Amino acid sequence: MPAIVTNKFRIHNAKQFVEAFDEVSFTAGAAITDASGLLNTNMYLFIGKVTPWADDTAPPTPTDSVSNTVYNHWRDMIAAKKIGSTDVSQVIPRYNWTSGSNYFAYNNANNALFDQQFYVMTDDYNVYKCLANNNSGGTSTNKPSGTGTSIVTTADKYKWKFMYQVSASRALKFVTPSYIPTQRVRKSNDTIAETTDSSFQYDVEIAANTSGNGAVEIVHVSTAGSGYTFEVGTVQAGHTETTTSAKITGGSGITGGIVDNDIYFTSDSGSGVTGKGGTITGYVAGTQVVTWTPALASSNVPEDGAGYSIGPKVAITGDGHGANVRSTNTATGTIGDIVVVAGGNNYGNAVATISTTVGTGGVLTPIIGPRGGHGDDAIEELGGFFVMVNSRLEYGESGNFTTNNDFRKIGLVAQPLYANGDVATASTIDQCVTITVQSWNSTAFAEDELVTGSASAATGKVVDFKNNTTLRLVDVTQGSNTTVGYDSIAGSFQANETFTGAGGASANTSAVVGGDFEKFSGDILYIENRSPVTRADDQIEDVKLIIEF
C-alpha cells in the first residue's frame, strides 16, 4: 500500500537526538527515581586509525557490518572526548542572501520546499524566510533587514519574515560554509529554553502564536488581471460620517463602478478605523458619499481626514474561518498586491475569489501558514533534520590525544562503559594500550611501527613513544601464548616482557594498562573516514560532524 515517512518524522528524530544530551544521567549504584533517568545519551567523539588507507587521498566508504560497527572500530580507536549539550545543534543548509539571486517563496502546497532556497542568512547573521518573491520568482536586489516580528516588504517586492539571529557563540560552533544552526528558544510554557540568542527569537515565537493554526498570512498574485477599479483618498468634511457612510475624494475616476468593490480605511486620527471597512453598496457622484456593509462598530466611525483605499473585493473561502484581505494595485487596472487584514485560523485549504463587476483575469493563491504561525518553530519550518556535533580537540587534551601521529577516522560512540563496568563520565579518554618502559636499546619506536611482545606474541601498532618511557599502541591482536596477560585473557601483552619493534627498537617493560573504555561497550553511531589529519603540540582541530536524519 502507498505510504510515506514524512519530514516531521525526520525532524522529530533529530530533535530527540539533540534533546537527549540534556536528559538526566543514570549511573551505576544510583537509585532510579525517574524513568527519564535511563534516557540520557552519554556520547563521545573518538579518533582512530593511525595506519594508512590503501589510498590516503581517497578513503574508503565505511560499511555498516557487524564486524566493523561492533568490533573493528574499537581496535584502532586512539582517544575520545565527551560531547555536551552545548556541542550539539540542529542545523539547516546555508543559503546566503546575495543580490541578484532568485529565491523560492514559502508555499504550503509545495512538497519539495525543503529542497529549495526559501530562506536566507544575511551578512549580519539574521535568518529570514521568504514569504513572497515579487509574485513571479523575481530577482532579489534589496537585502532584508530588521529583527522585528512583522513581515518585511523590501523595495524589490519580496516579503520576508525574520526568524532569528545566529549569536556569535553559536556561529563559532555551528556555522560552516554549508550549514547554519537553527533552534527553538521557547518551551511549551513560554519560558526561554535557550538563552544564547537573547530575546529576538523569543519575541518572534510569541508573536507568531497570535496567528494561530492555519492562518492565511500571504496571498500570492498569480495573475494580475486587468480593468479593475482602484482608488485612494481621504474622508472629506461636508457629511456626517456614520458606521456605514462617508464623503470621499481623491480619485477623479470614482464612479458607480466602485459598487461591489471593497473600501478599507488606511489611517485615522484616533477613531481606530484603520484596517476596517466593508463592501461598497452605493455611491452618489453628486455628493461623493459612499455607503458600505456591514456596519462598523460605533466606536470606529471614520473621521474627516481618514485615509481609504478602494479595490476589487476578495473573499477567502475554505475549511477555516475569519480570513479578511484587500487588494491594492501597482499599475492601472491590475492587482499588485493583497494586504492581509486578518489571517483567520484553522484553514487547511483555501480559495481566493475576486468579486467585482469591473475587471477580469486576476488569479490569487492564498498561502496557509505553518502550525503556530510563521516563526513559531524555526526547526520545523526550515527543515531542521540535520544535526551538527562540534568538538574542539585542543592540543594533546591532557596527553590522551596524540600530537605525534595522525588519524584517519572520526566517530561517535554512545553509552560506553569504563573497563570496570561503570558508566564513562570523564571529559577525555585514552583508549590506547599503554606500556610503561623500564629500559630500551636507544632505538626509538616509530609511529605506526609494528611491535611484538616476546612472551605473549601479541602485536600492536605504535601511536606514540612519549618521553622514552611510555609506549602507546592500537590495533592490538592477541598472540598464541596461553598465559593470561594484563587483561586476564590468554595471549594478551604481559608486564615485564620485552617489546620489539619492526624497525629494531627493543624495550623491557614493567606494566601494561588497557584503554579507559571497556572494549566493545556502548554503540558506535557514526563513522567518517578521512584523509590523514596531522597533529602538532600547538594545534587545535575544530571537528564538525553532520548527521542527516
Model-derived features: where do they sit?
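Extended assembly-interface regions of large multimeric machines
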Residues: 1-138, 147-189, 402-437, 442-453, ...
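Conserved, function-critical positions that sit in or immediately flank catalytic
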Residues: 156-549
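Short, solvent-exposed beta-strand-to-loop segments that form ligand-recognition rims
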Residues: 143-145
